[in-house]
């Protein structure tokens, strides 16, 4: 029994050791399997990173693609297996080439002017949309076959074809187009800029009765402008053609613009067309540094005038500061842009398209700077000088602004105040002595306020007095009367401002603008303050 018990005990111990060893081996196996899974995941991640790095490296190592402009399909055919074999003419930069077309790119869909993509073997592999960017050119002429003569800012003319998208659009002379880098194709039509701010269109309500002191000038312009419009049958009966244009010239601020507006209003009332049209243009605003832009604006103005006059309405094209726009060619005073602007203006004035119901009225302070071709008979052949108002005319002007309806000093009528005001302004005495001017002979002459007064100055004096009356009324809470004292203060302020403006004035320019003889004044000596 003892021997059996010992053997049984040994067997039990051996089995326990065997179980423990199996557990150890199982745990070791689990640990190895976990490590194997971790290594497998790490290997998978490494493989993915390696694949990604390889893809990035392949991308970085890829050859560059080249952009080119499509010109035309050179050749195209399909073999027995249905594979396309085609070539095309393209231009890249300055290189003009014939290159193959990839089989997956349909040659029939390649359009002239479109952007194509070339691979490293100079094979067309893709086609892009027409480039919307590029240099801008102005169309000078549209040829019968659709090609365009375009000019750059320097006036250099190039012959170009239209790109596929532009071939279907209506292109006219004066339009602007973008061109490709090779300047072989016109790509897109540039939208026309809104030039409405350059031309003020209005129906004037100014009448000749609103203008004072210019009876002689009004009569002359009525004879030149209003009579031909209102009595067309008589002019036709006597085979007499109305003037194409009128030039109003003289010192600034004396009613040139008012006269033009009154003419437009009078023509409208007498024509029975309902309303006249007054197109007001500022000469300097038409000047543009880009070649062809000023000419385009002039064409636009006359085209608009013809459109407005088509229904029988009289149209006045009023060009203010005409000397800045139509300066004498070759004068060298500016960049000589007038060498093209003047001919364009004259061609519109003399052109084959009639200017029925259209009258051009120009205004200028410097008639000596306007090109003589503009002033010759048959163009702006009626020239009316608008002089500075004398004392009698000044009374007529002031009566438009100083009326009996205003709160005046009791017992004093507007007519009496006007006489006092005019006497003060036109006084030839030391208290209205502005300056002395010296001519080319060294002779000094006095200049008084009356020598530089204008209709605008007279209105300004009355407005100053009215403003003072308003301020006094606000401070005192009672209506203040306009009287001799307020008018005298207004005249004194206007005199002092005018005298101060003379201090820094250039003698030659000041004398020309103020209507003195050209070149007559060489020096200005202001009076002591």
From Swiss-Prot:
Record keywords, A-Z: ATP-binding, Coiled coil, Nucleotide-binding
Superkingdom: Bacteria
GO biological process: modification-dependent protein catabolic process; proteasomal protein catabolic process
Claim: Coiled coil is one of the keywords in the record: yes
Coiled coil: 15-62
Presence of keyword tRNA processing: no
GO molecular function list: ATP binding; ATP hydrolysis activity
Family matches, as PROSITE patterns: AAA
Amino-acid positions noted as binding ATP in the UniProt annotation, renumbered to this chain: 253-258
Gene3D superfamilies linked to this entry: 1.10.8.60, Nucleic acid-binding proteins, P-loop containing nucleotide triphosphate hydrolases
Matches recorded under Pfam families: AAA, Prot_ATP_ID_OB_C, Prot_ATP_ID_OB_N
InterPro entries assigned: AAA+_ATPase, AAA_ATPase_domain, ATPase_AAA_core, ATPase_AAA_CS, NA-bd_OB-fold, P-loop_NTPase, Prot_ATP_ID_OB_2nd, Prot_ATP_ID_OB_N
GO (cellular component) term, any one: proteasome complex
Similarity field: Belongs to the AAA ATPase family.
NCBIfam families registered for this protein in UniProt: pup_AAA
Subunit record text: Homohexamer. Assembles into a hexameric ring structure.
Identification of the protein by name: AAA ATPase forming ring-shaped complexes
Lineage: Bacteria, Bacillati, Actinomycetota, Actinomycetes, Bifidobacteriales
């Amino acid at each position: 029994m003892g021997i059996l018990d010992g053997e049984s005990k040994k067997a039990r111990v051996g089995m326990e050791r065997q179980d423990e060893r199996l557990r150890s081996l199982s745990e070791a196996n689990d640990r190895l399997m976990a490590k194997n899974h971790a290594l497998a995941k790490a290997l998978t991640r490494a493989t993915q990173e390696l694949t990604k790095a390889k893809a990035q490296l392949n991308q970085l190592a890829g050859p560059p693609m080249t952009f080119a402009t499509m010109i035309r399909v050179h050749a195209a055919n399909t073999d027995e297996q249905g594979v396309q074999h085609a070539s095309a003419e393209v231009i890249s930069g300055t290189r003009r080439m014939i290159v193959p077309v990839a089989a997956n790119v349909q040659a029939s869909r390649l359009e002239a002017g479109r952007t194509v993509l070339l691979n490293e073997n100079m094979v067309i592999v893709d086609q892009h949309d027409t480039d919307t960017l590029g240099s801008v050119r102005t169309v000078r002429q549209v040829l019968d076959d659709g090609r365009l003569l375009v000019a750059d800012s320097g006036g250099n003319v190039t012959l170009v074809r239209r790109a596929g998208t532009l071939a279907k659009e209506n292109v006219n002379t004066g339009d602007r187009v973008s061109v490709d880098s090779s300047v072989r194709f016109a790509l897109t039509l540039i939208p026309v800029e809104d030039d409405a701010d350059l031309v003020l269109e209005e129906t004037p309500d100014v009448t000749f009765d609103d203008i004072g002191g210019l009876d002689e000038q009004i009569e002359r312009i009525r004879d030149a402008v209003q009579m031909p419009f209102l009595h067309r049958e008589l002019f036709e009966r006597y085979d007499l053609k109305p003037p194409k244009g009128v030039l109003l010239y003289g010192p600034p601020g004396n009613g040139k613009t008012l006269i033009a507006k009154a003419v437009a209003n009078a023509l409208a009332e007498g024509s029975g067309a309902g309303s006249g049209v007054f197109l007001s243009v500022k000469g300097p605003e038409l000047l543009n540094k880009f070649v062809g832009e000023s000419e385009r604006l002039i064409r636009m103005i006359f085209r608009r005038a013809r459109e407005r006059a088509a229904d029988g309405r009289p149209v006045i094209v009023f060009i203010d500061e005409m000397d800045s726009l139509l300066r004498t060619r070759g004068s060298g005073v500016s960049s000589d842009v007038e060498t093209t602007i003047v001919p364009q203006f004259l061609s519109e004035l003399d052109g084959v398209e009639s200017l029925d119901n259209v009258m051009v009225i120009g205004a200028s302070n410097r008639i000596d700077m306007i090109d003589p071709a503009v002033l010759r008979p048959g163009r702006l052949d009626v020239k009316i000088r608008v002089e500075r108002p004398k004392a009698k005319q000044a009374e007529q002007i002031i009566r438009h602004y100083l009326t009996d309806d205003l709160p005046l000093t009791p017992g004093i009528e507007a007519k009496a105040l006007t006489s006092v005001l005019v006497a003060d302004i036109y006084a030839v005495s030391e208290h209205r002595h502005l300056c002395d001017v010296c001519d080319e002979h060294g002779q000094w002459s006095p200049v008084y306020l009356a020598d530089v007064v204008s209709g605008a100055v007279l209105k300004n004096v009355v407005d100053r007095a009215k403003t003072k009356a308003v301020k006094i009324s606000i401070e005192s809470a009672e209506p203040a009367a306009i009287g001799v004292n307020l008018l005298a203060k207004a005249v004194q302020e206007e005199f002092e401002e005018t005298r101060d403006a003379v201090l820094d004035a250039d003698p030659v320019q000041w004398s020309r603008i103020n209507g003195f003889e050209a070149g007559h004044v060489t020096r200005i000596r202001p009076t002591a303050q």
